[in-house]
């Protein structure tokens, strides 16, 4: 399973918006290029799995496909454009501004951001609209990233250690991306453009300075925005922090080390409960987990409903549920049931929850638009792939002798990322960083070095987990976050929440 797939599990995933927004008229209202309408209108029905709250507004913003230098706020006549999908949850009282929610991934939709239903969120919503948006290429924004391989072009799944077969399958997928999405779009779909999109959204909202909350990969967008537009920044919260100084290899290596640490902490949790068969120490936990994966690799489990569960399915669910300790009991149940051969609907539902072909396509394409280097030494890349895979021993259940090149290794267009230690402009106000001590996928150290670079305070939560701000998980964290968003100029210091 490609490590890129793991990154799709990053960050704040979408859920239903709170329903306590004030009702608004169903007619349209235009705001600097965004034509807001009620999300109950028929044109937006496909945006939501469930009916949206009556007060939620939906709209689009046209931005350039390729930004000029310096970037313009809006598309010019005759040039190719991207249409960003946005939502607005109105403030419950007199409005003072807007808070833009920046989703993770890359490639996760953001029009339906999850907010806790508690006093801290209510205090923020009293005076601030909440803005969600799908990044370019994602969700309801167009053109949409698609890498669907046409019928008849599929290649057979390669056997274990079939490097040539795996790389041929990846080349087929890349060809489908180019055919379905377009070469011109693929070369303007990365984080560099996402930063300019964020500034265009700020301008369209009529905000002199951006106020935003960013999760996981979204913190990369936010940090680069702070560097590029310091005078147009009001307040930025970065939760689950990406280190701008890390190249792709270093980031992925550290992520795998983080997942390995979280697996061992999950195994320790298992040792304290009778409901998990991984108890008994780290080595025993690894042996039992590997034994289960090897069994499923040789013979996938088939539920009574005919649902097939493979070893890769279990790895995907494991990585997903390791992100949030509140769900470790579900992971324990999955592993226990599969080990006993009695897995049912709960297990298949969790697997379905962890898969999203659209998110996978967006993740891969946006990542490659950032990091691909067509002239890199293939042998160096293979050695790096090996080091990345070995770093997470819990997932290393099969002996691999060679490591195929992955999608970004074979991507034909050079990525625009330039890893660097950020330098905070004197014009930039303080940001606010949030991190959890045992975050599996954006290691705690990231937040430390980024907060230092931006000369900004860091809130440390001494727990496991990945992203939590405004989700109703920790009152200590959310109180400080809302205080900052309401009064960002007030002096603040580092804080620890336990």
Which role does the model predict for each range below?
Residues 22-313, 365, 371-498:
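Gly/Pro-rich cap/lid or specificity-loop segments adjacent to the active site
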Residues 335, 339-340, 344-384:
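Long, low-complexity segments enriched in small/aliphatic residues
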Residues 7-15:
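Bacterial N-terminal signal peptides
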Residues 1-7:
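Bacterial N-terminal signal peptides that target proteins for export
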Residues 242-260, 334-335, 343-356:
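Flexible "cap/lid" loop of the alpha/beta hydrolase fold
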Residues 17-21:
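Sec/Tat signal peptide C-region and signal peptidase I cleavage site
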Residues 184-185, 252-253, 317-321, 354-355:
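Second-shell loop/turn segments in exported
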Residues 301-316, 323-327, 354-361:
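Structural motif
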